[in-house]
Amino acid sequence: PRTQTYRVTYKVDLPADGNKARLWLPLPDINDSAHQFSQGSVWSGNATIAQFDTVPGTASPMFYGEWRGGGPRTATVSSVGKTTNRTVDLQHYSEQRGAAIPSGVKRYLQATKRIPLDGIVRKTALSIVKEANAHSPLQKAQAIYDWVVDNSYRDPETRGCGRGDIKSMLESGNLGGKCADLNTLFVGLARAAGVPARDNYGIRIDESAAH
Protein backbone atom coordinates (compact mmCIF):
# COMPACT_ATOMS: atom_id res chain seq x y z
CA PRO A 1 0.00 0.00 0.00
CA ARG A 2 1.13 3.55 -0.74
CA THR A 3 2.34 5.55 2.26
CA GLN A 4 2.44 9.35 2.34
CA THR A 5 3.71 11.89 4.87
CA TYR A 6 1.85 15.15 5.45
CA ARG A 7 2.39 18.28 7.50
CA VAL A 8 -0.70 20.25 8.56
CA THR A 9 0.03 23.77 9.85
CA TYR A 10 -2.18 26.34 11.54
CA LYS A 11 -1.00 29.95 11.41
CA VAL A 12 -3.07 32.09 13.75
CA ASP A 13 -2.92 35.86 14.19
CA LEU A 14 -5.56 37.00 16.67
CA PRO A 15 -6.78 40.60 17.08
CA ALA A 16 -4.71 42.62 19.57
CA ASP A 17 -7.75 44.12 21.33
CA GLY A 18 -8.87 43.19 24.84
CA ASN A 19 -7.02 42.02 27.92
CA LYS A 20 -7.21 38.30 27.28
CA ALA A 21 -7.52 35.88 24.38
CA ARG A 22 -7.82 32.11 24.25
CA LEU A 23 -7.39 29.66 21.40
CA TRP A 24 -8.35 26.03 20.90
CA LEU A 25 -7.19 24.07 17.85
CA PRO A 26 -8.11 20.45 17.01
CA LEU A 27 -5.15 18.19 16.28
CA PRO A 28 -4.73 14.86 14.45
CA ASP A 29 -5.60 11.71 16.35
CA ILE A 30 -2.56 10.42 18.25
CA ASN A 31 -3.96 6.89 18.56
CA ASP A 32 -2.21 5.19 15.67
CA SER A 33 -4.24 2.90 13.45
CA ALA A 34 -3.47 0.67 10.52
CA HIS A 35 -3.86 3.62 8.14
CA GLN A 36 -2.81 6.73 10.11
CA PHE A 37 0.29 7.31 12.22
CA SER A 38 0.96 10.45 14.24
CA GLN A 39 4.49 11.82 14.34
CA GLY A 40 3.78 14.59 16.80
CA SER A 41 2.99 18.30 16.90
CA VAL A 42 5.07 21.41 17.65
CA TRP A 43 4.19 25.04 18.21
CA SER A 44 5.80 28.47 18.16
CA GLY A 45 4.50 31.95 18.97
CA ASN A 46 4.08 34.37 21.84
CA ALA A 47 1.28 32.82 23.90
CA THR A 48 1.50 33.32 27.67
CA ILE A 49 0.27 29.77 28.18
CA ALA A 50 0.52 27.03 25.55
CA GLN A 51 -0.11 23.34 25.96
CA PHE A 52 -1.04 20.19 24.10
CA ASP A 53 -4.03 18.61 25.80
CA THR A 54 -7.25 16.73 25.09
CA VAL A 55 -10.79 18.02 24.74
CA PRO A 56 -12.36 17.60 28.21
CA GLY A 57 -14.25 14.34 28.52
CA THR A 58 -12.73 12.89 25.36
CA ALA A 59 -9.48 11.49 24.03
CA SER A 60 -9.42 14.02 21.18
CA PRO A 61 -6.13 15.96 21.13
CA MET A 62 -6.03 19.74 20.94
CA PHE A 63 -3.72 22.72 21.32
CA TYR A 64 -4.63 25.39 23.87
CA GLY A 65 -3.13 28.88 23.85
CA GLU A 66 -3.80 31.86 26.09
CA TRP A 67 -2.64 35.47 25.88
CA ARG A 68 -2.77 37.87 28.82
CA GLY A 69 -2.68 41.54 28.01
CA GLY A 70 -3.14 43.29 24.69
CA GLY A 71 -0.78 43.36 21.74
CA PRO A 72 0.24 40.90 19.02
CA ARG A 73 -1.04 37.36 19.49
CA THR A 74 0.42 34.75 17.18
CA ALA A 75 0.70 30.98 17.17
CA THR A 76 1.87 28.46 14.62
CA VAL A 77 1.04 24.80 15.25
CA SER A 78 2.31 22.03 12.97
CA SER A 79 1.40 18.35 13.03
CA VAL A 80 3.09 15.61 11.00
CA GLY A 81 1.48 12.30 10.18
CA LYS A 82 1.73 9.36 7.84
CA THR A 83 -1.15 7.70 6.06
CA THR A 84 -1.37 4.36 4.31
CA ASN A 85 -3.90 3.64 1.59
CA ARG A 86 -6.60 1.15 2.54
CA THR A 87 -9.47 -0.53 0.74
CA VAL A 88 -12.25 -2.82 1.89
CA ASP A 89 -13.45 -5.43 -0.59
CA LEU A 90 -17.13 -5.84 0.25
CA GLN A 91 -17.49 -8.43 -2.50
CA HIS A 92 -16.28 -11.01 -0.01
CA TYR A 93 -18.46 -9.84 2.89
CA SER A 94 -20.33 -12.60 4.67
CA GLU A 95 -22.54 -12.21 7.70
CA GLN A 96 -21.69 -14.33 10.73
CA ARG A 97 -25.05 -14.94 12.33
CA GLY A 98 -24.98 -14.71 16.10
CA ALA A 99 -21.47 -13.23 16.12
CA ALA A 100 -20.80 -11.21 19.26
CA ILE A 101 -20.29 -7.47 18.88
CA PRO A 102 -16.86 -6.52 20.33
CA SER A 103 -17.10 -4.61 23.61
CA GLY A 104 -15.30 -1.63 22.09
CA VAL A 105 -17.95 -1.40 19.37
CA LYS A 106 -21.06 -1.72 21.53
CA ARG A 107 -20.94 1.95 22.52
CA TYR A 108 -21.58 2.80 18.87
CA LEU A 109 -25.07 1.37 19.30
CA GLN A 110 -25.97 3.69 22.16
CA ALA A 111 -28.13 6.80 22.14
CA THR A 112 -26.67 10.22 22.95
CA LYS A 113 -28.13 13.67 23.54
CA ARG A 114 -28.00 14.44 19.82
CA ILE A 115 -28.65 10.89 18.68
CA PRO A 116 -31.89 9.55 20.18
CA LEU A 117 -32.73 6.08 18.95
CA ASP A 118 -36.45 6.07 19.61
CA GLY A 119 -39.42 7.96 18.19
CA ILE A 120 -39.07 9.38 14.71
CA VAL A 121 -35.44 8.28 14.40
CA ARG A 122 -36.27 4.61 14.94
CA LYS A 123 -39.43 4.85 12.85
CA THR A 124 -37.50 6.34 9.92
CA ALA A 125 -34.67 3.81 10.19
CA LEU A 126 -37.02 0.82 10.22
CA SER A 127 -38.98 2.25 7.30
CA ILE A 128 -35.81 2.62 5.22
CA VAL A 129 -34.66 -0.90 6.01
CA LYS A 130 -38.08 -2.40 5.28
CA GLU A 131 -38.49 -0.59 1.97
CA ALA A 132 -35.06 -1.76 0.83
CA ASN A 133 -35.75 -5.32 2.02
CA ALA A 134 -32.42 -5.13 3.85
CA HIS A 135 -31.56 -7.90 6.30
CA SER A 136 -27.80 -8.07 6.89
CA PRO A 137 -25.89 -5.24 8.62
CA LEU A 138 -24.21 -4.38 5.31
CA GLN A 139 -27.54 -4.22 3.46
CA LYS A 140 -29.01 -2.01 6.17
CA ALA A 141 -26.00 0.32 6.15
CA GLN A 142 -26.13 0.57 2.34
CA ALA A 143 -29.87 1.30 2.35
CA ILE A 144 -29.52 4.02 4.98
CA TYR A 145 -26.51 5.53 3.20
CA ASP A 146 -28.40 5.66 -0.09
CA TRP A 147 -31.42 7.23 1.64
CA VAL A 148 -29.29 9.94 3.25
CA VAL A 149 -27.61 10.70 -0.09
CA ASP A 150 -30.97 10.90 -1.87
CA ASN A 151 -32.79 12.96 0.76
CA SER A 152 -30.25 15.27 2.42
CA TYR A 153 -28.12 18.09 1.05
CA ARG A 154 -25.39 20.48 2.11
CA ASP A 155 -26.84 23.84 3.09
CA PRO A 156 -24.17 26.59 2.88
CA GLU A 157 -26.33 28.84 5.06
CA THR A 158 -26.03 26.47 8.03
CA ARG A 159 -23.95 28.02 10.80
CA GLY A 160 -20.61 26.39 11.58
CA CYS A 161 -20.69 22.63 11.13
CA GLY A 162 -24.35 22.34 12.10
CA ARG A 163 -25.88 21.11 15.35
CA GLY A 164 -26.36 17.45 14.49
CA ASP A 165 -29.88 17.49 15.97
CA ILE A 166 -31.34 14.70 13.86
CA LYS A 167 -34.63 14.47 15.76
CA SER A 168 -35.44 18.08 14.86
CA MET A 169 -34.26 17.53 11.28
CA LEU A 170 -36.55 14.55 10.77
CA GLU A 171 -39.51 16.20 12.48
CA SER A 172 -39.19 19.35 10.36
CA GLY A 173 -38.51 17.47 7.14
CA ASN A 174 -35.59 19.81 6.45
CA LEU A 175 -32.62 17.51 5.89
CA GLY A 176 -30.22 20.22 4.78
CA GLY A 177 -27.15 21.01 6.84
CA LYS A 178 -23.42 20.62 7.08
CA CYS A 179 -21.02 17.89 8.18
CA ALA A 180 -22.28 17.41 11.74
CA ASP A 181 -25.88 17.26 10.51
CA LEU A 182 -25.40 14.86 7.62
CA ASN A 183 -22.91 12.58 9.38
CA THR A 184 -25.05 12.36 12.51
CA LEU A 185 -28.14 11.65 10.43
CA PHE A 186 -26.50 8.54 8.98
CA VAL A 187 -25.02 7.47 12.32
CA GLY A 188 -28.32 7.85 14.17
CA LEU A 189 -30.36 5.97 11.59
CA ALA A 190 -27.78 3.18 11.44
CA ARG A 191 -27.73 2.77 15.21
CA ALA A 192 -31.51 2.79 15.36
CA ALA A 193 -31.48 -0.06 12.83
CA GLY A 194 -29.04 -2.04 14.98
CA VAL A 195 -25.89 -1.28 12.97
CA PRO A 196 -22.92 0.12 14.96
CA ALA A 197 -21.86 3.51 13.58
CA ARG A 198 -19.86 6.54 14.68
CA ASP A 199 -18.90 10.02 13.57
CA ASN A 200 -15.33 10.32 12.34
CA TYR A 201 -14.25 13.83 11.38
CA GLY A 202 -11.08 14.90 9.65
CA ILE A 203 -9.45 17.31 7.24
CA ARG A 204 -9.04 16.35 3.61
CA ILE A 205 -5.38 16.86 2.79
CA ASP A 206 -5.01 15.14 -0.58
CA GLU A 207 -6.98 13.99 -3.58
CA SER A 208 -9.09 10.88 -3.05
CA ALA A 209 -8.61 7.82 -5.22
CA ALA A 210 -12.27 6.93 -4.71
CA HIS A 211 -14.13 10.25 -5.04
For each predicted feature, which ranges?
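Hydrophobic/aromatic-rich core segments of domains that either
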Residues: 184-211
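Intrinsically disordered, low-complexity N-terminal segments that are enriched in acidic
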Residues: 1-87
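Proline-rich low-complexity regions
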Residues: 26-28, 102, 196
